Structures are given as C-alpha cells and as structure tokens.
Swiss-Prot record:
Biological processes, Gene Ontology terms: axonogenesis; neuron fate specification; positive regulation of transcription by RNA polymerase II
One GO cellular component term noted in the UniProt record for this chain: nucleus
Species classification: Eukaryota, Metazoa, Chordata, Craniata, Vertebrata
Protein name as it appears in the record: Insulin gene enhancer protein ISL-2A
Entry's localization field: Nucleus
Organism: Oncorhynchus tshawytscha
Disulfide bonds: none
Keywords for the protein's UniProt record, in alphabetical order: Developmental protein, DNA-binding, Homeobox, LIM domain, Metal-binding, Nucleus, Repeat, Zinc
SUPFAM superfamilies with a match to the protein in the record: Glucocorticoid receptor-like (DNA-binding domain) (SSF57716), Homeodomain-like (SSF46689)
Keyword Hydrolase set for record: no
GO molecular function: cis-regulatory region sequence-specific DNA binding; DNA-binding transcription factor activity, RNA polymerase II-specific; metal ion binding
Length: 358
C-alpha cells in the first residue's frame, strides 16, 4: 500500500523557469502536455491535469483538499482504496475503522467480536490459549480434541474439520488489542510454557523461604543446583510467594479489626463487653440493724375530721381527747384538755383544714 499526499503548486511566473529547468510537463493521466496555469502534482514527481486527477472507481475529482492513493497506475480516493485494498477482518471480511480495536493472530487481524473459535463459537478473550489452523481459530478444548483424534488415527468429523491437514499450530496467547488509531502488522510471540513444580522442589523452595524470604544471588544459585529450575523460575516463585503472603497478612489484619469492631459495637452503640456469671441463690435476710417504723398523724388532721362531723357523741369526743393527750410532748394534763376544747370554734362546721408543714 502506497500513501501519497496530495499537494498543489501554483506556478505563475515561475512556470517558464520550471519548464526550462525540468522540461515540458506531461499529464500522467492522459499523456498530453499540460498547458494549464495550475498543475496538480502528486508526490514525488507525478503531474496531472485538474480534470484528469480523479478516482478510478467513483470518478470523484481529487484536489488539494483530499488524500490521493495510487496503485497499479490508478488513482483512488481514500474510501475506495480502503474498501478495495485495506486490511479486512479474517472472519467477516469487513474493513476496520480508525477507532476499532483489533485482535491479532500472526498475520490475521480480527474484530473483537469476530475473534471466536470456529468450532464452538466461544469468544476468545485476552489470556485464552488458541491455535490457528488453515486460517481458522480453535480454542484449547477443540484443539485438544483434534489432537486426540489425530493421535488415535480416527477419521476426522467433516462437520468440524473441512479438508484440513493434521498439522496444528502451537497454541499462543491472545494479546491485548493495541490502542492505536490505525491497523498495522506486528510480530506475535508465543506464550512461555507453564512450569509445574514437584513436591521435592516445592519443599526446598518453601524451606528456603521460611528461612529468608529474600535470598541473595548466592542462595539462588544454590537453589538452581538443588532444584534443577532456571533462575527466572526461582525469582518469579519468590516474588509470587511474597505477594501472596502480603495479601494474606493484610486480609487477616482487616478480619481481626472487623471481628473486634463487631464485638464492641452493638446496634451502633460502642460499649464494654460484659460476661454473665453463674446464678446465685437470693438471700432474704437483710444485713444491718433493724429500724422501727412508727406511724405519726398530725393533730390538726384529727381536729379537722372532728370539726366536720355534724353530730358529736361522747365516745368519739373522748377518743379525740385521748389522742390529743397522747400526741402532746409530755405537758398534757386535765387542764390541757379544757384549754384545748376552749380554743375550738363555736360552730364546728365553719372549721376548714389548711395544710401544715410537718
């Protein structure tokens, strides 16, 4: 694909000097001599009449405002050139926009939605393993099934494999789609083989890690000799182990804080946790000195009740006198009763009780 930038040059009075220097200008489109005042020049040295420079597909006139593409001696506008010669999706055979994200498998380019297994139509995501066979994608499961059928010598199902050879490409990882505004080719890299450690190797690495989580270069060399692993595998194992332990310690710390918060918080209230003891028998005996309680009735209350009575009988009056004598402070006698009765009003019904502070 050749990208050519369209430029227009205005010759004016310098046209004679240019003709003297470079000769007569000939149109690439029609082959005739250009006598026009303006010449459309396509880099690097192609010159055209203004009426001859147009798209070979849609006949759109090309000038300095658009991009011109030249292929096999024909000129194309950008739209037709991309449609005819641009990179297309290997699955749907549709071109790409400048803002599309693509997935690559060797020399093939796919839309994000078109990057699927050709057998089960499972969408392949970045990180999934796949194989590319006869320009068709296979997920890891279908790749393994095909390998089993090939090793067993059984005939391949025509619904799954259509005229394919038994050679299958090695599975490679899906790479992240490039965040670029244009599509271009990149060399693909296969994934590294996953290393599986046996029990003896794991025991050796864990023992060394418990003694020193960050071994020096000498210790790593000794581990290489003891385990038979590569230095890169040992370095990555220690890095992953330290990362896992750090995450585990952070998680345990958060769990302890949450557990402590749950114990001390009850319905949003913070308090001190209490522990209930064993039940004990209730003792009715009261510790302390006995207290004698006596009932005291103020004298005015008895007098008020006496005054409100309409009929006075002798026994009730004698009881009132006896109560008054018992409520006195030791100074009561027969004369006191006479003085108390003399202080009563003539009309008992006119007596009204008033509260007295005791």
């Amino acid at each position: 694909m050749v990208d050519i930038i369209f430029n227009s040059s205005f010759l004016g009075d310098m046209g004679d000097h240019s003709k003297k220097k470079s000769g007569i200008a000939m149109c690439v489109g029609c082959g005739s001599q250009i006598h026009d005042q303006y010449i459309l020049r396509v880099a690097p040295d192609l010159e055209w009449h203004a009426a001859c420079l147009k798209c070979a597909e849609c006949s759109q006139y090309l000038d300095e405002t658009c991009t011109c593409f030249v292929r096999d001696g024909k000129t194309y506008c950008k739209r037709d050139y991309v449609r005819l010669f641009g990179i297309k999706c290997a699955n749907c055979n549709i071109g790409f926009c400048s803002s599309d994200l693509v997935m690559r498998a060797r020399d093939n380019v796919y839309h994000m939605e078109c990057f699927r297994c050709s057998v089960c139509s499972r969408h392949l995501l970045p990180g999934d393993e796949f194989s590319l066979r006869d320009e068709e994608l296979l997920c890891r499961a279908d790749h393994g099934l095909l390998m089993e059928q090939a090793s067993a010598g059984s005939p391949l199902s025509p619904g799954i494999i259509h005229s394919r050879s038994l050679h299958i490409a090695d599975p490679v990882s899906v790479r992240q789609p490039p965040h670029r505004n244009h599509v271009h080719k990149q060399s693909e890299k296969t994934t590294r083989v996953r290393t599986v450690l046996n029990e003896k190797q794991l025991h050796t690495l864990r023992t060394c890690y418990n003694a020193n989580p960050r071994p020096d270069a000498l210790m790593k060399e000794q581990l290489v000799e003891m385990t038979g692993l590569s230095p890169r595998v040992i370095r990555v194992w220690f890095q992953n182990k330290r990362c896992k332990d750090k995450k585990r310690s952070i998680f345990m710390k958060q769990l302890q804080q949450q557990h402590h918060s749950d114990k001390t918080n009850l319905q949003g209230l913070t308090g001190t946790p209490l522990v209930a003891g064993s039940p004990i028998r209730h003792d009715n005996t009261v510790q302390g000195n006995p207290v004698e309680v006596q009932t005291y009735q103020p004298p005015w209350k008895a007098l008020s009740e006496f005054a409100l009575q309409s009929d006075l009988d002798q026994p009730a009056f004698q009881q009132l006198v006896s109560f008054s004598e018992s409520g006195s402070m030791g100074n009561s006698s027969g004369s006191d009763v006479t003085s108390l009765s003399s202080q009563l009003p003539d009309t008992p019904n006119s007596m009204v009780a008033s509260p007295v502070d005791t």
